[in-house]
Amino acid sequence: MFDKMNLGDLGKVFEEIQERAKKLQEEQESKSFIAKSGGGLIKVTANGKGEIIDIEIDDSLLEDKDSLQILLISAINDVLKMVEEDKQRSALSMMTPDIFGQK
């Protein structure tokens, strides 16, 4: 993989990787993800950093604490999973063969 590169080229590759990583992080931070549970009775929104930024709860759940807790946990887990899967997809897309001089 690196046999046709000199150290100067390798430095450029690492610089490009850093630039792509920074751009990826900026793009990730601007994204938002929404998960619903209970047929939409609970809606949880997270940003691309995995921070919960909004929770909407239907009034009908306010009297049923057990259901509220179960549905809230489910929606939070779902939205965090969405964020993690997106991060992994983005990281893999950053590592294209052309970055190492391969085509």
From Swiss-Prot:
InterPro entries the UniProt entry points to: YbaB-like_sf (IPR036894), YbaB/EbfC (IPR004401)
Pfam families noted in UniProt: YbaB_DNA_bd (PF02575)
Gene3D superfamilies referenced in this protein's UniProt entry, alphabetically: Nucleoid-associated protein YbaB-like domain
Listed GO CC annotations: bacterial nucleoid; cytosol
Keyword Cytoplasm: yes
Top-rank taxon: Bacteria
GO molecular-function terms, A-Z: DNA binding
Subcellular location(s) of the protein: Cytoplasm, Nucleoid
Disulfide bonds: none
The keyword Nucleotide-binding is assigned to this record: no
Record key words, sorted: Cytoplasm, DNA-binding
HAMAP family: DNA_YbaB_EbfC
Assembly mode: Homodimer.
Function of the protein: Binds to DNA and alters its conformation. May be involved in regulation of gene expression, nucleoid organization and DNA protection.
Family: Belongs to the YbaB/EbfC family.
Protein name, entry field: Nucleoid-associated protein NIS_0256
Source organism (scientific name): Nitratiruptor sp. (strain SB155-2)
